[in-house]
């Protein structure tokens, strides 16, 4: 993702090297975490909360849209967010980084992600395989493209395609909904074998529970490389300096698409995210060791040497 690394110099200036041997300020004990209502971010944020709480921190989670979370970090009402999907959110995030309002981690917490428009496989087999094909199926689709929550960067990019009449989509309507609401609509369409175009992404159990295909030929409308994505951690601009121990944990907190998908299946089956996180840590002690290497308990000895 070349345009992500274009801003690496800016991010590096904001995320200075940590020194976990120094005692953190008392204010660092409270960790204010923003969580978007996306299952992947719920899973990773739950893992971070469980680990931080075990290290003696007091972690508070605020569930809100990505815009509210980013504004909360800018306004010093929140400390961090594990759900910056790049390039989908780059237009929102980069200006805030350049203005010194937020900071982005030096490395992503997830690679090999993907996010773009998708269709059920039966519709793909009927010939709706590319972005350019969508307009040909307008009547069957009811002139609708199904996105996620209102105000999301994803929806803004889909709406931009419509506003510019890109791919002949000028007369289409974007249907905004929550992740759960959108997927419920997809399942209803699947049961009727009805036509539907929706926003899909990896990691997510939808890739297993739904017979679906991603569209190609996006012409970078939702980012280069047909929706290839990475996920990054966002913090307060001075967080690495003020709370280097937490920052070290965040720098080391990286996930795989397979691991996230496994946790997401359990969450979507009705389990509480924190319970899923605890079970994951119990079954994967090597992850805990990797994430907490060189990280100290708050006000105490190192958790791992």
Which stretches of residues belong to each language-model region?
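Short, well-ordered beta-strand elements
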Residues: 25-40, 57-62, 142-146, 250
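C-terminal functional modules
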Residues: 253-305
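Pocket-flanking alpha-helical
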Residues: 45, 65-100, 181, 185, ...
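Ligand-binding cleft/hinge of the Venus flytrap
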Residues: 48-55, 138-172, 282
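Ligand-binding pocket segment of bilobal, Venus flytrap-like solute-binding proteins
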Residues: 78-82, 153-219
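A bilobed periplasmic-binding-protein/Venus flytrap-type ligand-binding module shared by bacterial periplasmic
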Residues: 114-125, 228-242
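Short helix-initiation/N-cap motifs at beta->coil->alpha
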Residues: 38-39, 57-72, 173-185
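A conserved helix-loop-strand patch within extracytoplasmic ligand-binding domains
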Residues: 101-150
């Amino acid at each position: 993702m070349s345009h992500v690394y274009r801003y690496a110099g800016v991010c590096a200036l904001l995320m200075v090297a940590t020194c976990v041997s120094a005692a953190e300020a008392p204010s660092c004990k409270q960790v204010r975490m923003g969580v978007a209502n996306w299952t992947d971010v719920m899973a990773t944020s739950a893992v971070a909360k469980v680990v931080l709480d075990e290290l003696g921190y007091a972690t508070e989670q605020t569930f809100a849209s990505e815009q509210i979370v980013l504004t909360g970090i800018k306004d010093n009402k929140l400390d961090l967010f594990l759900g910056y999907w790049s390039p989908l959110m780059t237009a929102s995030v980069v200006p805030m980084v350049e203005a010194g309002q937020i900071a982005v981690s030096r490395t992503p917490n997830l690679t090999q992600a993907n996010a773009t428009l998708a269709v059920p496989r039966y519709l793909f087999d009927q010939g709706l395989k590319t972005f350019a094909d969508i307009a040909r199926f307008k009547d069957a689709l009811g002139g609708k493209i199904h996105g996620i929550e209102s105000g999301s960067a994803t929806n803004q990019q889909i709406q931009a395609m419509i506003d510019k009449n890109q791919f002949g989509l000028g007369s289409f309507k974007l249907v905004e909904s929550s992740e759960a609401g959108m997927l419920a609509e997809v399942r209803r369409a699947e049961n009727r074998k009805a036509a539907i175009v929706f926003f899909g992404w990896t990691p997510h159990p939808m890739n297993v529970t739904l017979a679906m295909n991603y569209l190609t030929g996006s012409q970078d409308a939702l980012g280069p490389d047909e929706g290839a994505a990475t996920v990054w951690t966002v913090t307060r601009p001075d967080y690495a300096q003020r709370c280097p121990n937490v920052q070290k944990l965040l720098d080391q907190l990286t996930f795989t698409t397979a691991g996230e998908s496994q946790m997401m299946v359990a969450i979507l089956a009705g389990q509480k995210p924190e319970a899923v996180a605890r079970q994951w840590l119990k079954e994967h002690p090597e992850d805990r060791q990797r994430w907490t290497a060189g990280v100290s308990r708050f006000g105490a000895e190192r958790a791992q040497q």
